[in-house]
């Protein structure tokens, strides 16, 4: 009985997959882009529906975007997977209604309907634009289907397996990168390695291949790395101090406490 409640219904799962494919394939420069809060909600519902409650530790202070995402996911508590899928679909309906209300239909290209078509096929109560717009788009779609089948673009990111991904097959960071377009991909590129972190802390450093990490060719390509620069400055000041000690007459005429101490030791 418990497993039946936990497993989502087939219709709900199909609607969820269609909504995920639409969000992941929204054009970057299209007429509408979800807001920051909407992307966080989509991300949290997606993680809850595919992985369950948030059990991973919160990211560090150096990853503010990761902390926002973690807070949104963790705020869902013990919400079931089916409830998370339903919430994702409901949020998708609100977004569709917002697009219809705010974006002028004259600015929406006809091929834009290809991104939203999966929703109208599986979600009966999906908000729809005016009938005049639907008739124009439906006629375009029928011409494509009857003429050239290859012109019909299938959803590129539609999940092939309805089962949620297992934690053993992907690490949490890999999962975040896979579904990043559900939330914050366009706002903050993910730092996948310490090398990228060093480049973000030190602007202007050129990226180096792993095998040339130590040499790096910084003298020819650009500014030196942080470590090499500090060591070079240290050597410069050390040599300057040596020259100053050799050429300074005051140093020779006025021996310091160390010279007096060595002289007294020799006399004793």
Swiss-Prot record:
Residues 12-101 form the ACB domain. GO terms for molecular function: fatty-acyl-CoA binding. Residues 156-167 have a biased composition (Pro residues). Binds medium- and long-chain acyl-CoA esters and may function as an intracellular carrier of acyl-CoA esters. The modification Phosphoserine is found at residues 166, 171. It comes from Homo sapiens (Human). It comes from the Eukaryota. Pfam families: ACBP. Keywords: Lipid-binding, Phosphoprotein. An acyl-CoA binds at residues 23-32, 43-47, 69, 88. Disulfide bonds: none annotated. InterPro entries: Acyl-CoA-binding_prot_CS (IPR022408), Acyl-CoA-binding_protein (IPR000582), Acyl-CoA-binding_sf (IPR035984), FERM/acyl-CoA-bd_prot_sf (IPR014352). GO terms for cellular component: cytoplasm. Residues 151-175 are annotated as: Disordered. This is Acyl-CoA-binding domain-containing protein 4. GO terms for biological process: fatty acid metabolic process.
């Amino acid at each position: 009985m418990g497993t039946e409640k936990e497993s989502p219904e087939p219709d709900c799962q199909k609607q969820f997959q269609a909504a995920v494919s639409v969000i992941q394939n929204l054009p970057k420069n299209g007429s509408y882009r979800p807001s920051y809060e909407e992307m966080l909600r989509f991300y949290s519902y997606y993680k809850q529906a595919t992985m369950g409650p948030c059990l991973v530790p919160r990211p560090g202070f150096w990853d503010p975007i990761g902390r926002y995402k973690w807070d949104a996911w963790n705020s869902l508590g013990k919400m079931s997977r089916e409830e998370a899928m339903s919430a994702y679909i409901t949020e998708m309906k609100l977004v569709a209604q917002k697009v219809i209300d705010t974006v002028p239909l004259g600015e929406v290209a006809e091929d834009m309907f290809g991104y939203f078509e999966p929703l109208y096929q599986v979600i009966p109560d999906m908000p729809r634009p005016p009938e005049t717009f639907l008739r124009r788009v439906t006629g375009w779609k029928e011409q494509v289907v009857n003429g050239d089948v290859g012109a019909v673009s299938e959803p590129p990111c539609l999940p092939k397996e309805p089962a949620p991904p297992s934690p053993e097959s992907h690490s949490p960071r890999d999962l975040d990168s896979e579904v990043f377009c559900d939330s914050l991909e366009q706002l903050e590129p993910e730092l996948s390695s310490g090398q990228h972190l060093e480049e973000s802390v030190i602007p202007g450093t050129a990226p180096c291949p792993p095998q040339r990490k130590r040499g790096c060719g910084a003298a020819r390509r650009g500014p030196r790395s942080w470590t090499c620069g500090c060591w070079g400055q240290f050597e410069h000041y050390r040599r300057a101090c040596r020259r100053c000690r050799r050429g300074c007459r005051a140093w020779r005429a006025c021996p310091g406490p160390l010279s007096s101490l060595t002289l007294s030791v020799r006399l004793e």
